[in-house]
Each structure stands twice: as structure tokens, then as C-alpha cells.
Amino acid sequence: MQRRTTALYFSPTGGTRTYVRAVAAAMPHMGGEVDLTRPEERRKVHMFGADDVVVLGVPVYYGRVPEVPGLLDGLQGEETPAVLLAVYGNRLIDDALAELSDLCAARGFRPLAAGAFVAPHTFSAKVAVGRPNAGDLAAAAELGRRAAEKLSGPVRWRPSILPRPVRPTVRSASAAWPVSGLARRAADGWKAPPLPLQWLIWRRH
């Protein structure tokens, strides 16, 4: 089966988009991308079948998937393999990957692989500047290659190995800041020391 790869991302400052493209480029039959940062794209219905594979990435806000209206509402899979990315500002990803996995599974996607990657922190001009670097992008490409290898043969799906339970979402006034305001806070400055890249694979047995 020749699967078509589609890159999907919400990326106000561009870091998540860079990682998603690096992962997707290492997978076969790249079919295009959907920029969920654009409200008009979030209002559309994007349907994927069992012969597709998606690479979906979001930044981590307050340890969770961003509370953006309709962020994933237009996505619909049908047993569609998904590679999931959470991009964080060199602190912690908290429950973001687990939450993203649950949200995608509820929309018909099958999480196949997942990774957490570092990009400049949205709220600081000094944290994680210069990321992603060459090593980060090489690791992202490796994740894409290994995910593609898993899809080259029969896949036996199993429940997520991400930590549970996911903490309840706490909504606050700060969580409702406009996305454009968040994007404007990204700036250059001191380069944070690198943390070990964290990534994991849903294994095939």
C-alpha cells in the first residue's frame, strides 16, 4: 500500500511547522500540508482514510494542547495512522502528547508514533533560542523514517503507552490570549543549554 503523507500543524511562531515538515519529509509520498494556524483552514473539513498517514504537530501551552477554537474539529480520520508532535519551550511537555493522542483517537486516527521537540519559548526571549538546530532536525527526520518503517508491514495497534491519567484542563484568563499576541512574544536572545531530545515510538509486535 502506498500511503500519502500529509503535514498538519498549528504553529503561530513557526517552530512546530519546521519540525512537522522535517518528519513528513522523511516519509514517503508527501501529499501536501494543512496550516491549522489559519482560521479558514480550521473551518474546513479535512478527511483522511486508512491509506493516508498524517504528521500532526502542536505547540505546548501551559502543558496542554492549545485552547484554540475548532483547532482539531475539522479533522476526520478513518483508521488513519498519525505521527504526533508536541513542541515545547525547553521546560516540560506535561500532558500535551497524551492529550493530543486522545483527541486524535476520538477523531478516527491511530497514533503510530510520537515525539517531543524543543523550540524557542513563546513567553521568554532567552529560552531555547536557536532551536531547532541541526541535531533536532536530524532527530525529527529519524522519527519520520522509523514511523515509515513501521508502516511498511502489518501494524498491530495497541493502546497508548503515554502516562495516564491526563490532568483535567484548567481554563484561565491567560489561556485565552490571542494567538497573534503569543506569536509577537517570540524573540532572539540567550541560547538555552540543550536538553536531551525526548521521543518515543508505538512499537509493532
Segments predicted by a language model, with ranges:
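Short, flexible coil/turn micro-motifs enriched in small/turn-prone residues
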Residues: 9-10, 172
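Charge-patterned, long linear interaction tracts outside catalytic cores
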Residues: 162-172
